[in-house]
Amino acid sequence: MIVFHLAITTAEDYVAKREPHRRAHLERLQGLRAAGIVIGGGPAPDGRRVDIFYRLQQPGQVTPAVEEDPYFLAGAWTAYTPHSFTHFVEPWERVPLVVDGSRVATIVEGPAADEDMAQFALIEARGAGRLVFGGFFEGTRTLAVMKTSRADEAIGWLADTGFWMKDGLSARPWLHVL
């Protein structure tokens, strides 16, 4: 299985375009999650982008995974960029669906100084209840979903391990829907 991060661009009128299709979209994602395909997903608080994490058997499955979604079909999602992880730290639990925006996490991205040791640090962060899931793309680039709404705290959790340079990390808020 290949784990993909899908960075999805939304329409200017995203909220209006998605609303009539929200129930069908959420039901589809929950069905894909029950089948082990969707790991997690949600939008940025401002609705300008969506990040969804899929577990697929082959790269050719990315297109139908996104383009068969009711949001894509309705024009609420306008473009997407897939990135495949070379190493991925799985979530320990399947969180319940939260659609009211109350579960805010932080996505941290940046290069790791030592990918092997950084992978252990991500596993340790998950065990400490700080990491939801995350991993590495080609070239030691990290994406980690951290269990905090504070960007400085999320960056600090990684930088304090010594396997990431604080100045090389960026963070953004993310609504962890599922």
Regions found by a protein language model. Give the residues of each.
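Short connector loops at helix/strand junctions that flank enzyme active sites
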Residues: 47-49, 77, 103
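Short S/T/G/P-rich N-terminal loop/turn motif that feeds into the first structured element of a domain
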Residues: 1-39, 86-141, 149-151, 159, ...
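An amphipathic, aromatic/His-enriched active-site/gating alpha helix that lines ligand/cofactor pockets
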Residues: 31-32, 57-84, 149-177
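Helix-loop segments that flank and shape redox-cofactor active sites
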Residues: 39-46
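Short hydrophobic/aromatic beta-strand micro-patches
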Residues: 53-56, 109, 145-148
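Acidic/polar N-terminal loop/beta-strand segments that form early-domain functional surfaces
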Residues: 9, 43, 55
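Short acidic/glycine-enriched loop/turn segments that link adjacent beta-strands
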Residues: 46-49, 139-141
